[in-house]
């Protein structure tokens, strides 16, 4: 078993626990010595804090990674009430790249599909279905039927 929890299921009640998550790198942000990634799986996403610049600098969007770390409360003022995992973050102690991704034909984390032709979306359907709206539609369809 790779993971102990799903990314979207982590809450404040998990603070202090060491967990292992597996998922895709949705976004990476570097802030002088510390990097933040949004780790996404089918259940949602969670912010991961990486102190090792060398490791974080190599990560790219849609790389599949395995992260082990401790759930901590976000510093005051950095909470994000618009997402369920906005109170917490995972302080990474170990990161393993499971699979690298080729350069993407379009951004997966953006909701804007106006600049992406239908032909490209169909050709790369496996990427298109990772986007929030199509994934939500499939989930709803699965629940209804």
Listing of model-derived features with the role each one plays in the protein:
Residues 1-145:
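Class II aminoacyl-tRNA synthetase catalytic cores and aaRS-like
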